[in-house]
């Protein structure tokens, strides 16, 4: 099992092995190999116990910190602050979501048991072109609305691209407002685009709603809008292959709260002296030109969204 980001979520019902995992790390932390636990990792693994957790955290650096939902403050803003401004990587074991933390839809796992073996498997899977669903399904009709999470460069790009089509673009304003927006538009055929890098908290409810309305709602979760622009290949002379293939090798988790933040800064820095100079408030014209915008849309294309 490879930890890639600063926040990893492990969830599941009682009896699936979540607490056992935490207890084994805690036992190894206390007594090492005498605990009977074998733990192999490239960096220290520690368990954060309920007692004096603040002082414990202050002594952990560049470690993988396992935290069980039994910790009373695990969902508090204070704990979230410690997670976001730390050199550590956190594995949070909880059945509940964390609305105050930006974690990826790709870093939510459950423990799968096969005989005496246990493994981590993603709760949500990319079913092609960054579209996520609880069950395999495909929209049976074209979409009438493209809904995105922001009102800035991403929304401006989509609005420009579909200006001469029958597809309407709308903004939910924030990722947390997407569910409420969908609740009020049951009769519409909606293609949702949101930044997967920070959508983990909302994935369960939004994807369950999509499963109910699978004929009319599709949820597309690329890493971020900036990631789409970088992946499209429209910026000539920019070699981003290594960064896109293994972002974890380039991203300092203490500096960037999520991969979304990293890709925004990376794109801004790399395009500073070109016609693609990126500004989150206003999409550069160069990205919106016909062939360029078509390359971006090809990464998420679905029915009449292309």
Give each language-model segment a name.
Residues 52-77:
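Conserved P-loop NTPase "ATPase switch" module shared by AAA+ and STAND
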Residues 27-38:
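Post-Walker A helix-loop "phosphate-sensing" segment adjacent to the P-loop in P-loop NTPases
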Residues 10:
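Hydrophobic anchor at the beta1->P-loop junction of P-loop NTPases
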Residues 16-18:
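Conserved glycine(s) of the Walker
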Residues 21-23:
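Post-Walker A alpha-helix
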Residues 72, 111-306:
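Acidic, divalent-metal-binding catalytic cores of TOPRIM
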Residues 66-67, 88-97:
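Structural recognition of the conserved hydrophobic beta-strand(s) that form the central parallel beta-sheet
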Residues 36-60:
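Short glycine-rich substrate-engagement loop in P-loop NTPases that contacts/grips substrate
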């Amino acid at each position: 099992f490879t930890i890639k980001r600063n926040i990893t979520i492990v969830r599941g019902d009682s009896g699936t092995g979540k607490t056992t995992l935490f207890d084994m790390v805690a036992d190894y932390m206390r007594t090492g190999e005498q605990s009977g636990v074998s733990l192999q990792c490239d960096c220290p693994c520690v368990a954060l116990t309920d007692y004096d957790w603040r002082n414990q955290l202050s002594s952990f650096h560049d470690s993988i910190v396992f935290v069980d939902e039994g910790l009373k403050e695990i969902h508090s803003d204070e704990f979230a602050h410690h997670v976001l401004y730390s050199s550590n990587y956190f594995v949070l074991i909880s059945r509940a979501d964390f609305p105050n933390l930006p974690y990826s839809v790709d870093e939510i796992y459950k423990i799968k048991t096969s005989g005496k073996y246990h493994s981590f498997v993603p709760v949500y899977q990319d079913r092609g072109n960054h579209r996520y669903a609880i069950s395999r399904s495909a929209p049976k009709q074209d979409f009438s609305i493209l809904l995105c999470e922001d009102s800035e460069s991403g929304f401006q790009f989509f609005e420009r691209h579909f200006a001469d089509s029958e597809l309407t673009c709308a903004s939910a304003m924030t990722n947390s407002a997407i569910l409420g927006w969908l609740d009020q538009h049951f009769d519409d055929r909606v293609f949702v685009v949101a930044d997967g890098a920070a959508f983990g908290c909302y994935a369960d409810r939004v994807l369950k709603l999509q499963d109910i309305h699978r004929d009319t709602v599709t949820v597309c979760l690329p890493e971020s809008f900036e990631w789409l622009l970088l992946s499209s290949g429209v910026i000539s002379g920019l070699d981003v292959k290594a960064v896109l293939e293994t972002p974890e090798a380039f991203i300092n988790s203490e500096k960037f709260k999520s991969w979304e933040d990293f890709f925004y800064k990376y794109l801004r820095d790399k395009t500073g002296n070109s016609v693609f100079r990126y500004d989150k408030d206003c999409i550069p014209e160069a990205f919106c030109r016909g062939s360029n915008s078509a390359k971006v849309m090809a990464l998420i294309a679905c029915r009449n969204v292309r």
